[in-house]
Amino acid sequence: MGLKITKGQLRTKDLNQSSSKSSQSSRIGVDTCIFTRMLPRINTAINLTEHLLRRSFHSLTNLQKTQVKERLHELERHGFILNKTSKQLERINSKKRRQLKKLQKTAYPKDQAFHILRKFHKINNEALADTKLGPTSQSDLKFLSLTKDKRLFYTILGVNGEQLRDSKLIANDVQKFLKRGQLEKAVFLARLAKKKGVVGMNLIMKYYIEVVQSQQSAVDIFNWRKKWGVPIDQHSITILFNGLSKQENLVSKKYGELVLKTIDSLCDKNELTEIEYNTALAALINCTDETLVFKLLNKKCPGLKKDSITYTLMIRSCTRIADEKRFMVVLNDLMNKIPDYCVDSKLLFEYCEVICSQKSPKIEKQGMGLWALCEYFQFDKTIFKKYLTQSDFPTLVPLSHWNINKPFPLNKHVVGLFMNYCLKNKEYDLAMEIFKTLEAQNNQMLDQSIYHKYMETVITTRPITCGDECLDIYERVASSAQISITRRTLILVYNAFQRQSLKAVINKDASNAEATLHKIRGFIDSVEATYSSKLNGKVYRFNSWKFLFPIVKNLNMNDKVSTVELKSILDEYLKSLLNGEFGKEFKASIEDKRFVTLEGIRLVKVLTERIKLPSLDSEEIASLKGTERKKFLARRHLLRLKQILLEDLADIEGNSRRKGDSENTSTSEERIMEDLAELILETSYDKF
């Protein structure tokens, strides 16, 4: 249905339009005026917006083709649609390469490793039957030389590629291999690590030097590591030189030349440090060719500042000079050249030790080592002058030469060197007086070793009273909280009594012999005897009998020890037997067991001869009464004991003739021995 409009309505509409146009024209005039005024501002805003839009569009412009366009382009050119675009293929290949690279850094599972060994290396199942793969296995070493597959190496060594990038982890694994004695795997792991295996290879060199005691192997590792791509650092050189310097025997000339060659190389590169120079000096001092150390001393190394350790080693190198005159000339010349800042107590101690160790009759006779100790350290010079006369030997360099006003304080190393030198050159009286002076001052520097040297001096110089004096020294040492008692201390006391018991003044006088015997037995009772719950008392240990029997033998060489005293010693010996001190489970050498058993047999023999009776027939034996009867029975018991001890001696020597069940036989013999020992212990020899 259409819309109808009348003429009146049309006229009204036209009028309205004309009026609206007139009003609009008036408004436009006003707006034009306003717009004209605002135009500069609008232009500025439009320009700014346009500028920002331009930068945004420029930064967001996509200059690469999209995957859709690339596929359409290929469709137009070749008539088919690509499954993967080149960019997608590149991304996939890159991902595969990363995964493969990551896989190459992992170890094979053990089943896969065995499969590879069978397939690619043609190893049969029989060879692999008893083979285990892993870091703790020893049966897989042969496969390390068959393959170049790193993943198989990782399986055998128990590592992966990521761990090879960490030098600390490599060093820890190398240390584990070395503790298990797997040197081949340790070396192979360090080789695989290349630059990260420097610390591990240093540990291997140190192991060869200190544990295996193979300097040649350490030198081989030092040379080969360059070819393996494992660099040599400062610690590598120090470990090698230090190991050569600590070898018990002098190292050969070729090792000395290697040291010199290495130092020359470092010196040419201006990389030589004091540590490397000092260790090289120490190594060359221990070389058979003494000329090499002096070549190093005369070598000019630019940039090297010699310290006190360097000069100390230089002094030590003078010990290689055999000629006496040249020794003193070189040594004194060196001492004069030492700068003030390098002189300390350690350097002067080394100087004194070098003089004391020189095996020159003239130097020893002149006592130059003692005078050097007196000059540089705070010894009492009045005591020295009382026992020594200063002979014509080269004058010592005075302390004033280095602007030092007074001698250095004493320490245990200096006193120990002094005591050693006195023992070596038989200056016993000087050593004893100096020791007593220091002990009277309650000097804390007197340690265990110095007391031992003093006891050795007493044993050497005073054979008649050395046992009593060493026992007194032992008691002083035992009362000191700073000094501990060792087995060496006890042995020195025993040695002192053994030496004292050999003197005729002691063993030819009954009272002196028994007094000495009582002292040594009292010492054993208080120090070495242990409580036995089985016997409810103290018993002597096996080690005590090794020393007591010789002392008893010496004291009784003139039959001055009474029968009662010998019976008392036999009683102690039987108590030790009953307590199991000489049993099979006791750990002692065959020689010691044989010696103690023989001495026990000799003691029984002496007692048997002491209570010997005239020959009697059966009727006379039956008629014996009282003391004679007891004496006869006691002698019979001793003879039975002697027979048992002889059988024990045969067992020790491996010549036993006992037959039957060993367990039953030993049990019955123990019962017989216990019964016999109880009978002997109950018998008193006071009236024999």
Swiss-Prot record:
UniProt KW Amino-acid biosynthesis keyword: no
GO cellular component term, pick one: mitochondrion
More about this protein: Present with 432 molecules/cell in log phase SD medium.
Location relative to the cell: Mitochondrion
Gene: MRX1
Region (Disordered): 1-24
Annotated function: Component of MIOREX complexes, large expressome-like assemblies of ribosomes with factors involved in all the steps of post-transcriptional gene expression.
Alphabetical UniProt keywords: Mitochondrion, Transit peptide
Subunit details: Associates with the mitochondrial ribosome.
Transit peptide: 1-46
Name recorded for this polypeptide: MIOREX complex component 1
